[in-house]
């Protein structure tokens, strides 16, 4: 690693120390000697041989807090790596769930394959968050070695190459092309995360992929829902979003003010209240969750349980429920390197006195898809919810309602 690179990462490590000391919700930092750890990781940084190892030192420093919402976002990479596959937890087991047509992954993997190991890492619920962070943000891989079990239980190994898409390491915001790319880099992600509602008989099935809607968007959605007797709110795969969006969602489901919980920040504790307004949906409510339902999804599911408002069905949730802010950093003048830190600035304690971080929400009815369901494209969980809603929807048809949308490369 060059001297300039060493200095760049040393600045990042120092900023990580300072942002946490300034903004982290727990002034005691869980009893950690943060400055002593900084000195320790500064020593580790001197041994880093390249940028990747340097980034891992910064990430490991923040991981000492063992907090799902506090982490390092490395600089914009000169290459984008598309794996061509998606994987997800079902219970304590990881499965391949999606394959990009035409990718190397599609020629070697099968939907429904159980992922035993990825490039030497054993994949399970306990380490799943760290594995996702490593492969997707911290150290994207140009190839992945898999140890797999087919839906029939047959073991095999596969070596899957990722697709490399080149882009600039440094964006020059005085360059019109670079500026356009910077301003539009999130548009395709937003399109893929859009909310969708399907009406079948007396039920509305609302696929809410993120809590990213404003009050007007939520009001329009509830305008559709109000026409039906049952709402199936599908929060599977929903990682969370903004607390304001959660408040508006809760307000649309209850005829009274609802305390989401207490926001315990560094200096004070304040109640978070969803104020009811207008005409709430008063019909039957079924909420679907899975292991990828995080943050606001978990809060909403637990509120439904605490308030006895409906039934929660599916898998135990992600257990990643804190409130954080992202602090962006740059190095360089006109030609900038962008990176930053997510820092938890509040703990959310629910009205029953419990914190969902590291515990999650256990559904009222535990119901998981099988490997065979995944392989065949069946959604047995949604089909069961439809049955409870009094509508006919077989697992095959349920699996086709909300097809996965790959972003263009």
Residue positions per predicted region:
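Mature N-terminal segment immediately following signal peptide/propeptide cleavage
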Residues: 3-29
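Stable alpha-helical elements in mature extracytoplasmic
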Residues: 8-13, 20, 37, 41, ...
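Sec/Tat-exported extracytoplasmic proteins
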Residues: 20-28, 41, 45-52, 62-69, ...
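Extended, small/polar residue-biased N-terminal targeting/export presequences
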Residues: 28-94, 143, 151-196, 393-409
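PDZ/PDZ-like domain segments forming the peptide/carboxylate-binding groove
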Residues: 77-129, 213
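Conserved PDZ fold ligand-binding element
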Residues: 105-129, 232-234, 304-307, 312-314, ...
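Cleft-lining beta-strand/loop regions that shape enzyme active-site pockets
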Residues: 141-334
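Low-complexity, Gly/Ser/Thr/Pro-rich intrinsically disordered linker/tail segments
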Residues: 364-405
């Amino acid at each position: 690693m060059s001297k300039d690179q060493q200095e760049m990462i040393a600045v990042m490590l120092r900023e990580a120390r300072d942002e946490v000391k300034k903004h982290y919700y727990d002034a005691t930092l869980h009893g950690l000697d943060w400055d002593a750890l900084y000195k320790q990781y500064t020593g580790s940084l001197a041994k880093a041989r390249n940028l990747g190892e340097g980034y891992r030192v910064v990430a490991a420093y923040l991981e000492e807090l063992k907090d799902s919402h506090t982490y390092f976002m490395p600089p914009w990479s000169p290459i984008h790596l598309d794996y061509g596959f998606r994987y997800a937890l079902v219970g304590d087991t990881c499965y391949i769930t999606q394959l990009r047509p035409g990718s190397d992954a599609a020629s070697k993997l099968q939907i429904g394959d159980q992922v035993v190991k990825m490039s030497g890492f054993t994949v399970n619920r306990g380490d799943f968050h760290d594995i996702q962070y490593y492969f997707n943000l911290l150290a994207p891989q140009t190839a992945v070695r898999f140890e797999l079990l087919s839906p029939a239980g047959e073991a095999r190994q596969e070596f899957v190459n990722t697709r490399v898409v080149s882009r600039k390491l440094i964006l020059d915001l005085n360059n019109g092309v670079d500026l356009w790319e910077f301003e539009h880099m999130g548009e395709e992600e937003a399109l893929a995360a859009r909310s969708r509602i399907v009406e079948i008989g007396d039920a509305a099935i609302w696929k809410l992929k993120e809590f990213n809607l404003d009050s007007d968007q939520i009001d329009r959605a509830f305008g559709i829902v109000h026409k039906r007797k049952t709402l199936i709110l599908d929060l599977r795969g929903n990682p969370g979003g903004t607390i304001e969006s959660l408040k508006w969602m809760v307000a649309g489901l209850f005829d009274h003010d609802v305390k989401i919980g207490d926001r315990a920040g560094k200096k004070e504790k304040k109640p978070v209240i969803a104020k009811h307004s207008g005409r709430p949906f008063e019909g039957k409510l079924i909420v679907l969750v899975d292991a990828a339902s995080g943050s606001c999804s978990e809060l909403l599911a637990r509120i439904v349980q605490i308030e006895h408002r409906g039934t929660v069905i599916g898998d135990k949730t992600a257990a990643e429920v804190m409130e954080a802010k992202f602090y962006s950093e740059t190095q360089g003048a006109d030609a900038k390197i962008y990176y930053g830190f997510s820092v938890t600035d509040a703990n959310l304690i629910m009205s029953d006195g419990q914190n969902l971080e590291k515990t999650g929400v256990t559904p009222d009815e535990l119901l998981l898809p099988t490997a065979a369901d995944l392989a065949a494209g069946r959604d047995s969980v949604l089909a069961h919810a439809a049955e409870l809603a009094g509508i006919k929807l077989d697992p095959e048809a349920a699996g086709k309602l909300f097809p996965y949308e790959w972003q263009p490369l």
